[in-house]
């Protein structure tokens, strides 16, 4: 409804229609396409206006060998009212749970701004269909010894309604962290 597809095509971009519902399904499809194309690095950026594309270069420059880098909103420029107190507390709790269960340091589990090396994507084991995809990427890195770096980023207030439901999606993310610890 916002003409994104036609604008992207006019600019010469290849537009890929998502085959499944949910953020996780879309990301997995994007990873598959990336591996087919043969590039060396990939950036994942939520397109909700909260992240700043001009910071992509900083993330790409910070990817460790065969690893990933996560844009860290909580140690960066978290703009006023960009994150509700419920989401901030939930992210803190989920991030703490992730480190407690999986042992690999992470500062912002629910960040929507990541950069990946090809080797890291080839090694990720993913099956998530929804918002728990970041937790699954983290646990895959933890268990497969994929290096993780963190870069402070700017995070702005979202325009429009968020699709993330604090309690429902937070529970799903926690469940993914626990299941990945057990299996």
Question: PLM ranges: what are they?
Answer:
Residues 104-105, 126-129, 139-155:
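Catalytic donor-sugar/metal-binding loop of nucleotide-sugar-dependent glycosyltransferases
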Residues 16-36, 41, 53-131, 157-168, ...:
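Acceptor/aglycone-binding surface of glycosyltransferases and processive sugar-polymer synthases
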Residues 173-183:
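C-terminal, non-catalytic tails of nucleotide-sugar-dependent glycosyltransferases
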Residues 10-12:
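Short, structured coil segments at secondary-structure junctions
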Residues 136:
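Cell-envelope/extracellular polymer assembly enzymes that use nucleotide-activated donors
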Residues 1-5, 49:
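A conserved acidic beta->alpha catalytic loop
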């Amino acid at each position: 409804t916002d003409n994104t597809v036609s604008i992207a095509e006019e600019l010469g971009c290849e537009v890929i229609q998502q085959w499944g519902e949910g953020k996780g399904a879309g990301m997995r499809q994007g990873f598959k396409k990336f591996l087919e194309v043969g590039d060396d690095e990939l950036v994942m950026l939520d397109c909700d206006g909260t992240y700043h594309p001009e910071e992509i270069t900083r993330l790409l420059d910070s990817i460790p060998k065969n690893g990933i880098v996560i844009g860290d909103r909580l140690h960066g420029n978290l703009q006023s009212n960009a994150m509700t107190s419920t989401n901030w507390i939930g992210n803190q709790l989920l991030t703490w749970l992730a480190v407690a269960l999986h042992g690999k340091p992470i500062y912002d589990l629910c960040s929507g701004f990541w950069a990946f090396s090809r080797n890291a994507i080839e090694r990720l084991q993913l099956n998530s269909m929804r918002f728990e995809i970041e937790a699954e990427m983290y646990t895959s890195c933890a268990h497969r010894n994929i290096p993780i770096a963190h870069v402070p980023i700017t995070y702005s207030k979202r325009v429009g309604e968020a699709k993330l439901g604090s309690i429902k999606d937070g529970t799903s993310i926690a469940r993914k962290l626990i299941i990945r610890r057990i299996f």
